[in-house]
Amino acid sequence: MDKLVIAGKAYSSRLLVGTGKYRDFDETRTAVDASGAEIITVAIRRTNLGQNPEEPSLLDVLPPSEYTLLPNTAGCYTVEDAVRTLRLARELLDGHTLVKLEVLGDPKTLYPNIVETLKAAEILIKEGFQVMVYTSDDPIAARQLEEIGCVAIMPLASLIGSGMGILNPWNLQIIIENAKVPVIVDAGVGTASDAAIAMELGCDGVLMNTAIAAAQNPVLMASAMKKAVEAGREAYLAGRMPKKLYSASPSSPVEGVIGNMSGK
């Protein structure tokens, strides 16, 4: 069976989802279930995982026994903040080491700061973390992050929360062709066709949050995204027909057609 393998663990779903921007935890759980996702990313700086005992905890609706939680460093702009946040996550989740690193460079665009990301990744990997890393669609940056030991490369399709879809498929294709670890599109997906295109390009998975949470019907969109990722993956494995401006061979046979029969 075709599985997504990250850091030695196999997953049936290639759709990863976030937990922010929903109306409440109940809607979060319902949408996650509809998506079929097994890996759920959580913003440690914005989500209660037990650090505030007086408030409801996300772990009550998305327990680690049912999902692989992926703590992330959303909102971090420095190496120090990112590393501190993931150390806290490891404490809150009883030694959990699979994490998503993002070090942002600009509060308006939320574009990644690659220099700081490389520094933070190196520190975290030395401390035993398995780092899935948010990055730009720069193939050189992606290669450098893989070389220092990141277990998955997560290039943006377009800016976080923009819903603009895949703006540079050529760079993504270069990253995919060169990578020896999973490549998961992270950020910019707006609708199901974007997810399908990412998978058709050969991405190993797609991570999204706003595309589902900001939809008019988040649960229905989660279901659509599940199907899109599955369809895109199957299309990639099947191998599409080559593109041609003109086709000299019709899809239906002409032999035996009235008017083409010999002797008539």
UniProtKB/Swiss-Prot annotation:
Residues binding 1-deoxy-D-xylulose 5-phosphate: G161, A187, G188, N209, T210
GO biological process, one term: thiamine diphosphate biosynthetic process
Pathway field: Cofactor biosynthesis; thiamine diphosphate biosynthesis
EC number(s) recorded for this UniProt protein: 2.8.1.10
Reaction catalysed by this enzyme: [ThiS sulfur-carrier protein]-C-terminal-Gly-aminoethanethioate + 2-iminoacetate + 1-deoxy-D-xylulose 5-phosphate = [ThiS sulfur-carrier protein]-C-terminal Gly-Gly + 2-[(2R,5Z)-2-carboxy-4-methylthiazol-5(2H)-ylidene]ethyl phosphate + 2 H2O + H(+)
Catalytic machinery residues: K100
Keywords, ordered alphabetically: Cytoplasm, Schiff base, Thiamine biosynthesis, Transferase
CDD domains in UniProt: ThiG
GO cellular component, one term: cytoplasm
The protein's role, per its UniProt record: Catalyzes the rearrangement of 1-deoxy-D-xylulose 5-phosphate (DXP) to produce the thiazole phosphate moiety of thiamine. Sulfur is provided by the thiocarboxylate moiety of the carrier protein ThiS. In vitro, sulfur can be provided by H(2)S.
Assembly mode: Homotetramer. Forms heterodimers with either ThiH or ThiS.
Similarity-based family: Belongs to the ThiG family.
Protein name per its UniProtKB record: Thiazole synthase
Organism field: Nitrosospira multiformis (strain ATCC 25196 / NCIMB 11849 / C 71)
Lineage: Bacteria, Pseudomonadati, Pseudomonadota, Betaproteobacteria, Nitrosomonadales
